[in-house]
Amino acid sequence: MAVAIAAARVWRLNRGLSQAALLLLRQPGARGLARSHPPRQQQQFSSLDDKPQFPGASAEFIDKLEFIQPNVISGIPIYRVMDRQGQIINPSEDPHLPKEKVLKLYKSMTLLNTMDRILYESQRQGRISFYMTNYGEEGTHVGSAAALDNTDLVFGQYREAGVLMYRDYPLELFMAQCYGNISDLGKGRQMPVHYGCKERHFVTISSPLATQIPQAVGAAYAAKRANANRVVICYFGEGAASEGDAHAGFNFAATLECPIIFFCRNNGYAISTPTSEQYRGDGIAARGPGYGIMSIRVDGNDVFAVYNATKEARRRAVAENQPFLIEAMTYRIGHHSTSDDSSAYRSVDEVNYWDKQDHPISRLRHYLLSQGWWDEEQEKAWRKQSRRKVMEAFEQAERKPKPNPNLLFSDVYQEMPAQLRKQQESLARHLQTYGEHYPLDHFDK
């Protein structure tokens, strides 16, 4: 009996935070476990009424030795709004977005898809050095971006180009970054797809996994201290969630009560490592309650489910100063990057299922068609127009020179120190002597 009671309490803890999905998040007075608690008043009890007084946990004593089995805890449910045919399942969960906003969602997703195809092929042709596509995960980017304020700070990993796309980041700057030309905001110093834009509150991407998580928590803590009325959103994958930085960030956010949304894209693979080898527990959302973080699991291929969850998490994170964890279940249809061949670790049939049967773009297109907001002629015209827009930006980026080599030494110090100036002069002498061995005509003078 004691075993059953203990197991039921653990089960209720996990289910209680996600069973009702957004209904729970919408409770106006509810607070996550991250809230600070007043010191517990020590009381005297008789031996017959002995209750735990430990300050580190809320629990009861039991008198039988038993370890809690992980399989006793049911999986956190997956919240969704639309089925795979684009039909609203529960009318009360319909976000009732206006036609213009839904069309922007769709056009952002399809434009991103078109850009991915062109830049992937350009890398295969040797025109750029590296690329990472977003196939199959467009709904997680755009659905979450649409639910944020434009001033909310974004910390991405390396597969969130759709967030910038939704914030109207110009195609010319996407291309400039991948080509590393003179129009690149980062002046050619980053790998391709490592975007950043101060004006759109998108922090420059860093390659090392999960380093952005504690950084994002620090930014959220600063926003809280400044009463900035903004949220920080931090994107990462289920593989990055295994890094130590993720665990430190979760605990930091909970104990300091930071207005942050942890957004995990669980796409099934961390490069070649499947989720079955990545963790043994119930995914990433199940970790939230252990840190005292309000958590939810959503269908990442349902752009409306992603929108609703992010919208509500944002509202409460700002109003109540507490962190939220969203695990968006999706699938990485493309290779991890142009350096990867995913056929070595997964089947073509597996990929085709997600591409043909459960793609976020197809699901939203079904919704648009059912509403009478889109038709086949508009689809053909938009596909043609979007490809033309991407190709124009692509050709423009290809014609522009690379940044001047002297920019290697700028933007670190307000005034260049003597040692750095010495290195700059050394490079200039080297290029003057051996310039014929370098493609200097490709660089800005």
Curated annotation (Swiss-Prot):
Chain positions found as Phosphothreonine: T338
Impact noted for substituting S337A: Substantially decreases the stability of the BCKD complex
A Gene Ontology molecular function term of the record: 3-methyl-2-oxobutanoate dehydrogenase (2-methylpropanoyl-transferring) activity
Binding site for K(+): S206, P208, T211, Q212
Documented effect of changing F409C: In MSUD1A; decreased solubility; loss of mitochondrial alpha-ketoglutarate dehydrogenase complex assembly; loss of 3-methyl-2-oxobutanoate dehydrogenase activity
PTM characteristics: Phosphorylated at Ser-337 by BCKDK and dephosphorylated by protein phosphatase PPM1K.
Residues with the N6-succinyllysine modification: K356, K380
Domain of life: Eukaryota
Cofactor: thiamine diphosphate; Mg(2+)
Enzyme superclass (EC): oxidoreductase
Binding-site positions, Mg(2+): E238, N267, Y269
Protein EC: 1.2.4.4
Disease field: Maple syrup urine disease 1A: A form of maple syrup urine disease, an autosomal recessive metabolic disorder due to an enzyme defect in the catabolic pathway of the branched-chain amino acids leucine, isoleucine, and valine. Accumulation of these 3 amino acids and their corresponding keto acids leads to encephalopathy and progressive neurodegeneration. Clinical features include mental and physical retardation, feeding problems, and a maple syrup odor to the urine. The keto acids of the branched-chain amino acids are present in the urine.
Function: Together with BCKDHB forms the heterotetrameric E1 subunit of the mitochondrial branched-chain alpha-ketoacid dehydrogenase (BCKD) complex. The BCKD complex catalyzes the multi-step oxidative decarboxylation of alpha-ketoacids derived from the branched-chain amino-acids valine, leucine and isoleucine producing CO2 and acyl-CoA which is subsequently utilized to produce energy. The E1 subunit catalyzes the first step with the decarboxylation of the alpha-ketoacid forming an enzyme-product intermediate.
Designated name of the protein: 2-oxoisovalerate dehydrogenase subunit alpha, mitochondrial
Species whose genome carries this gene: Homo sapiens (Human)
Recorded name of the encoding gene: BCKDHA
